[in-house]
Amino acid sequence: MSQAAERWDLSYTQNRELSWLAFDQRVLEEAADPSVPLMERLRFLSIFTSNLDEFFMVRVGSLTDLALVAPNARENKGGFSPAEQLRRIYAAVVPLVQQRDQVYRELIEALAEHGVADIPYKELKNGEREYVRAWYREAMRPLLMPQIIDPSHPFPHLKNKTLYAAALLREGDKRRLGIVGVPDVVPPILPLPARPGAFVRTEDILAHHLRKIFKIYQIEEQAVVSVTRNADISYDEAMDQEDLDLRAQMTKLLRQRERLAPVRLEMQGEAPALQAMLLRRLRLTAEQSYVCTCPLVLKYAYQLDSLDSALFYPPHAPAYPAWLDREVPMWEQIRQRDVLLFYPYPSMQPFLDLLRQSAADPAVVSIQMTIYRVAGKSAVIKHLCAAAENGKAVTVLVELRARFDEGNNITWARELEEAGCRVIYGPAGYKCHGKICLITRKEKTGLSYVTQIGTGNYNEKTAALYTDFSLLTADRTIAADGVAFFQNMLIGDLRGSYGKLLVAPVSLKQTLLRLIDGEIARGDRGRIILKTNAVTERELIDKLAEASQAGVRVDLIVRGICCLVPGVPGKTDHITVTSIVGEFLEHSRIYCFGEGALRQMYLSSADIMTRNQERR
């Protein structure tokens, strides 16, 4: 028996990685659902694929590292070692890839009936073929850098998630590998002007021209391939270098990420000898390779938007709340009553109006805010810069370690500083994941405040796609908490105490445990409802199981990973778990304890995850 099994009760928990794969399978099921509009199904297939890409980069990458440094470590939900987890992951992905192939075939057949056609190069009509050839000669061929692999031409670095056309070449009795990348600057698809909705994928065009590119060789096998690399970089060293520029250190780390080891090889098309050669060069095993018929990248689904509206969900435009008056300053309306926005049904515009108005308001003296992820063209950043340029004291805590947004946040930090904002970063060892904005106004009667706290990012794009709550309040206790929070962040103090806000790592998990204990004391009159993106934190899982065993009714609404298994007799009989996957991404976190007059409810930016509860 493993140490994890001896220490933890594994009868009502499951491994987080396998639970995550079950979540991504639910996304795949949306792509297979005939009740979902066809183009939305194709987009769900793209989301499934990009989700899986990130899973391999981060989770499989992390486990690969862990298998080297702590091979005997056992995780506490399934009792598996790193190597056992990797074996189970690689095996579990095989049927998912096969199901994706099947769903893609069905979708392409159904979409073709509506004129949306992924046309193989070999099926192009004569006029279309000439059009594609001309495009290839003018737009793609000059950018190509083909290479053969031999003693004079070493195996190149294959960039993460870049598409390559690879070929097994023969010259006399010698075999060589030939490879050429799809240039980053070319579009993923080439529309066919004579057939609206029809297109050729760029990698298919490149693959067709391999015989001309490697014209002095005989091509024995060929395929479109992609390598997924470990992207799990460690920030600890950068954060520990007190005398160094953190932005420069993060930039250096991002460059290192591009060179990390491969963890997966994908191939579109059967080419066993070519596959074996690539695996040997990449130092991967056969179980780390997947052969499919579906395209390896499906993001082109988001470029096909000028089609029959029946192929999409009905258009949804977030509305300006009817209970707010656009002619009255937001500050005055919030002072009269709290404003709770539930994106994407009401829009983010009232909050943006508050920022814009505050930037120009002579009475506003300061704006303090956290930034984790913002939009590519961010109105939030624009208004913060305008406020600083208008003489306001603007402090922005930018989290440089927001995964895959590190580069963007480095750029935003620089832009904010150049506008006159004071920029600080999250403390060493902890990401700042909280979403809070504090605006201070000087009036005749003294200082007044508006505080915004929310479950999601300050991102106009995702606010139209994700469900999130945003509370705008003039509550003075919450404002005092906001003042204390930013003062503590400025001096690096994580131990601060707060009146209404729960702040990890000091009071969040501890309070949740206490609140669950309160419901346990009420027995079968107790009630707990938790809506979150993930449930992985072992101590909280055990406490919820204890609540179930005391008769407390527990409803968990969990979009993604849920390591707690409901309905286990004598352990979790009174717990239900519901996962919602649909048109909008469920992102809000709501924690509710008790019923009626005893009910306590919290909005949160934190999931029931160890990293959220203890390392943020």
Feature map (PLM): residue ranges:
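N-terminal localization/anchoring segments of enzymes in phospholipid and broader phosphate metabolism
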Residues: 1-528, 546-550, 562-616
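Hydrophobic alpha/beta core scaffold segments
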Residues: 553-557
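Active-site glycine- and acidic-residue-rich loops that bind
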Residues: 538
